[in-house]
Amino acid sequence: MSLSTLFSPNTYNINSKSQTLNNLPSNPTSQTNTLWSNNAYNPPHLMFGSTDLSNGGGGGGQKGEKGDKGETGSNGLKGETGSNGLKGETGSGDKGDKGDSGTDGLKGQAGTDGLKGQAGTDGLKGDSGTDGLKGQTGNDGLKGQAGNDGIKGDKGEPGNDGLKGQTGTQGIKGDPGAKGDPGTSVVLSSGIWTPSVTFSTIFTGITPSTSIYSRIGNIVTFSIFTNATIPANMASGIIYFTVPVASSDFNGNNVIGTASITGNSTGVVQYGILTATASTAGIVLSMKIQASTSISVAIYATGQYFIPPG
């Protein structure tokens, strides 16, 4: 309660006694005031006892028992704010009981959502960046493995025969050709003969057998067969044979054929050639056969020679 309320004309109940406080002094703390003479510095609301305040009051009686807690009164009107009073001495009264907890207040309604702000303007477009440096050329990739050969396709079916073309018109008969010059005659002959031996060295037991020849124009082809015996480790041997057809153009420097022995012979041919004699038309066999002992051999000689025209 404020001081202005305390010192306004009001009626207070003190120990079931009523007293109207009127015309209170402006300075209730003065010690010369009769009303406060026995209770200096103690406002009336702190005094206790059964003495009627109108008779001056007696001394304070004994402190009675603490009464029951009264019901909470309604709030009085708020008085005007008085001037600050002097600070009282600290009281030593007992601490009052803790009041009941008040009920929770009602929850306020949710406020409405605020308005959405306007969209900002678009920012300025930045400058284009400079082109990056060109990268180095990469290494060549590894060469791939060769692919497998493809499977050969099936053989196609034979095509149909093409259409026969139309017969062309008959051509114009050409003029008769000029008569040619008379041709030369060509000698054609062949036969068998048994060559004769006109000279020999190293070889012994020479026995020529039936041989063959053929002539086409100026060329004579021949084949001679003969048996002979050679000594062990022979040197080069020679046999002269007569020709089947005479020729006037023999030259000893010309090789006209070769010679060999049959497979049944045990010797080894080191060489065998045929040449021609210049002095007397004949076929010359020059041959060397290697053998560790004297053996008989069968010799085959083939060749060609030329017959001049005339």
Curated annotation (Swiss-Prot):
Classification via Pfam families: Collagen
Residues annotated as glycosylated: 227, 264
Region described as Disordered: spans on this chain: 1-183
Comp. bias (Polar residues): 1-41
Ranges where the Collagen-like domain occurs: 61-119, 123-182
Entry superkingdom: Viruses
GO terms classed as biological process: extracellular matrix organization
GO MF, one example: extracellular matrix structural constituent conferring tensile strength
Keywords, alphabetical: Glycoprotein, Repeat
Keyword Glycoprotein on entry: yes
Similarity comment: family membership: Belongs to the sputnik virus V6 family.
Name assigned to this protein: Collagen-like protein V6
